[in-house]
């Protein structure tokens, strides 16, 4: 399947564009020999960072081994000098959720059939050591527009490979579908996909999600607590068996959560003709229409924001005669409106045009949504303003860096305040250090520092961390380097400031960041009223 030498153009004719991402475009293509149609994801590898390239290789590796009727299949993977081509099934049926609202009849039994196909794909993934991590409506497609077309799971860009003896720590997924263990930054594995299935099944039955809040922090608090319910009247007509399955999927403790294989054996799924209700659910269809409209509106807003940022960097690079290394572009509103007198590069013009098209689509979606609101949407519609935006490991890395800066500042504050209890909670008992007070010796453990906490408690000391630079070293380790300013009063009450360069290595153990090494470069002070250690 992997072809590293044959040119893509030698085997495929490229047709119209089907979609576009930050560093890739999806086009319909036709195999020259067989005449079969496919969807080619074309990635510009010149614009990828080393981390992004690793993700691409991981996605291709995972997709190559997944061969299932309910998964969008990868048929070919071709690496060329500047581009990588992933050739997938061409699925023409659109999103599952969009198809449901166009149906004349939709029942609980239909929802059972939908979730069964999703669970079949997830069970297959899990049996092959793959966790999808981004189950959501946008990634549930239909093979064709034919009645009864198979549901296809798509987009394995965030998928990971795991085994039964290991867990993952990366923060990835889409907010409304994230599991409690991911939000708590606990180790996680296959059960995260089952939680997302529970959210999807809830939506399939009533047309709105189980967790909702306009404030993302409150949304996350709901999810971590598993705080959802079955309000009347829409849930009164749902069978107890369906609610029981949702409860088993939305179990906060991942160890007690039902597995995909177990869920497939539940009578509501494997014997739906006898257990699931066959009554048409018009209210669900109506709510789902509004749910879809909100998803599309938010996607358009995200597209406008992304393209605006991207086109501005391109504008900047064009005016300076250089190209941004990450390939992103951004520009201001006046340039979009055409009020700038500066000449525009062809690439910038394309970015501006894309922004204008996205803005037009956004306006149309906004009008449609307003029209739907005027028709009187039910008060039970629930959707978070953030719930459709996918979070990947890059977002996780930003959050991880912020955590490192925060915990480092807390440690410095503990030193300034002579708070040895907090200091010991933040430092590993075997922490090593190089510092002037040790006269060039490598010190192990924290007892050496106790002396500085026990003495001079009345000194006023304030520490400021400047320009922290965090390097992430895997999932459980990080290094931070910074300039430290220490302000203090001497015995005569005169203020002094001392500057030093410091670096700390942090390791996450049992869910907590602990400092395992510190190195500080400065001359020991002749003034003994304060130590910086």
From Swiss-Prot:
Q: Where is this region: Disordered?
A: 316-347, 369-400
The biased composition feature labelled Polar residues covers 316-345, 377-391
Give the top-rank taxon of the lineage listed in the UniProt record for this protein: Eukaryota
Give the reaction(s) catalysed: L-seryl-[protein] + ATP = O-phospho-L-seryl-[protein] + ADP + H(+); L-threonyl-[protein] + ATP = O-phospho-L-threonyl-[protein] + ADP + H(+)
Using the record, list the residue span of the signal peptide; answer none if the entry has no such feature.
none
What UniProt keywords are attached to this protein's entry? ATP-binding, Calmodulin-binding, Cell projection, Cytoplasm, Kinase, Magnesium, Metal-binding, Nucleotide-binding, Phosphoprotein, Serine/threonine-protein kinase, Stress response, Transferase
**Briefly, what is this protein's role?**
Role in locomotion and neuronal cell fate specification. Required for the regulation of synaptic density, egg laying, defecation, and meiotic maturation. Required for viability under chronic osmotic stress in which it acts downstream of osr-1. Regulates the synaptic trafficking of glr-1. Bidirectional modulator of neurotransmitter release with negative modulatory effects mainly mediated via slo-1 activation. May suppress the functional response to an internal pacemaker, perhaps by modulating the activity of the IP3 receptor.
User: What family does this chain come from, according to its entry?
Assistant: Belongs to the protein kinase superfamily. CAMK Ser/Thr protein kinase family. CaMK subfamily.
Q: Give residues where Phosphothreonine occurs.
A: 284
Q: Gene name?
A: unc-43
Q: Which SUPFAM superfamilies match?
A: NTF2-like, Protein kinase-like (PK-like)
Q: Which CDD domains match?
A: STKc_CaMKII (cd14086)
Residues annotated as the enzyme's active site: 134
Cofactor(s) needed for function:
Mg(2+)
- GO molecular function (one): protein serine kinase activity
Q: What is this protein called?
A: Calcium/calmodulin-dependent protein kinase type II
Supply the source organism for this entry. Caenorhabditis briggsae
What's the subunit arrangement here?
A: Dodecamer. Subunits are tightly packed around a central ring-shaped scaffold with extensive contacts between the regulatory segment of one kinase and the catalytic domain of another enabling cooperative activation of a subunit by the adjacent molecule. Interacts with and phosphorylates daf-16; the interaction promotes daf-16 nuclear localization. Interacts with egl-2 and tir-1. Interacts with nsy-1.
Q: Its Enzyme Commission number?
A: 2.7.11.17
Q: Which PANTHER family match?
A: SERINE/THREONINE-PROTEIN KINASE
BP GO terms, sorted: regulation of neuronal synaptic plasticity; regulation of protein localization to plasma membrane
List locations, semicolon-separated.
Cytoplasm; Cell projection, Axon; Perikaryon
Tell me what controls its activity. Answer: Ca(2+)/calmodulin binding removes an autoinhibitory regulatory segment located C-terminal to the kinase domain. This releases the catalytic activity of the enzyme and makes accessible a regulatory residue Thr-284. Phosphorylation of Thr-284 by another kinase domain within the oligomeric holoenzyme keeps CaMKII active in the absence of Ca(2+)/calmodulin by preventing the rebinding of the regulatory segment to the kinase domain and by increasing the affinity of calmodulin for the enzyme. Can respond to high-frequency Ca(2+) pulses to become Ca(2+) independent.
A GO cellular component annotation in the UniProt record = postsynaptic density
């Amino acid at each position: 399947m992997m072809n590293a030498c044959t040119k893509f153009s030698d085997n495929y004719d490229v047709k119209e564009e089907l979609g576009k991402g930050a560093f890739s475009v999806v086009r319909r293509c036709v195999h020259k020999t067989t005449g079969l149609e496919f969807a080619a994801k074309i990635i510009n590898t010149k614009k990828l960072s080393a981390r992004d390239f690793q993700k691409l290789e991981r996605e291709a590796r995972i997709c190559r081994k997944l061969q299932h009727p309910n998964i969008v299949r990868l048929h070919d993977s071709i690496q060329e000098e500047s581009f990588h081509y992933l050739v997938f099934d061409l699925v023409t049926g659109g999103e599952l959720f969009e198809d449901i609202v166009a149906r004349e009849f939709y029942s609980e039994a239909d929802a059972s059939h939908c979730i069964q196909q999703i669970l079949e794909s997830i069970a297959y993934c899990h049996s092959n050591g793959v966790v999808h991590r981004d189950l959501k409506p946008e990634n549930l497609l239909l093979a064709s527009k034919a009645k009864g077309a198979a549901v296809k799971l798509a987009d394995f860009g965030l998928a990971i490979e795991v085994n039964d003896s290991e867990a993952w720590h990366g923060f990835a997924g889409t907010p409304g579908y994230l599991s409690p263990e991911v939000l708590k930054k606990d180790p996680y594995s296959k059960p995260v996909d089952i939680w997302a299935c529970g959210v999807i099944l809830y939506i399939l039955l009533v047309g709105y999600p189980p967790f909702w809040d306009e404030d993302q922090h409150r949304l996350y608090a709901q999810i971590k607590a598993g705080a959802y319910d079955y309000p009347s009247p829409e849930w009164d007509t749902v069978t107890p068996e369906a609610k029981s399955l949702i409860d088993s999927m939305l179990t906060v403790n991942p160890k007690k959560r039902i597995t995909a294989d177990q869920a497939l054996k539940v009578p509501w799924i494997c014997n739906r003709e006898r257990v699931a209700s066959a009554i048409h659910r018009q209210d669900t269809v109506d709510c789902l229409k509004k749910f879809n409209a909100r998803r599309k509106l938010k996607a358009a807003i995200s597209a406008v924001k992304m393209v605006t940022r991207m086109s501005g960097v391109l504008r900047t690079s064009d005016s300076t005669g250089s190209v941004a290394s990450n390939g992103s572009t951004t520009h201001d509103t006046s340039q979009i409106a055409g009020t700038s007198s500066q000449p525009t590069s062809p690439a910038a013009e394309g970015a501006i045009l894309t922004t204008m098209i996205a803005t037009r689509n956004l306006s149309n979606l906004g009008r449609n949504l307003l029209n739907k609101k005027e028709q009187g949407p039910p008060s039970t519609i629930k959707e978070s303003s953030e719930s459709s935006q996918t979070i990947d490991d890059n977002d996780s890395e930003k959050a991880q860096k912020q955590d490192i800066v925060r915990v480092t500042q807390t440690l410095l504050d503990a030193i300034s305040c002579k708070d040895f209890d907090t200091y010991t909670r933040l430092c590993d008992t075997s922490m090593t250090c190089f510092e002037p007070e040790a006269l060039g010796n490598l010190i192990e453990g924290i007892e050496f520092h106790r002396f500085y906490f026990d003495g001079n408690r009345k000194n006023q000391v304030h520490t400021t961390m400047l320009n922290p630079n965090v390097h992430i070293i895997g999932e459980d380790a990080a290094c931070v380097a910074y300039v430290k300013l220490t302000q203090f009063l001497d015995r005569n009450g005169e203020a002094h400031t001392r500057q030093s360069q410091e670096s700390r290595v942090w390791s996450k153990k049992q869910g907590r960041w602990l400092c395992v090494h510190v190195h500080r470069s400065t001359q020991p002070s002749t003034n003994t009223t304060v130590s910086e250690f």
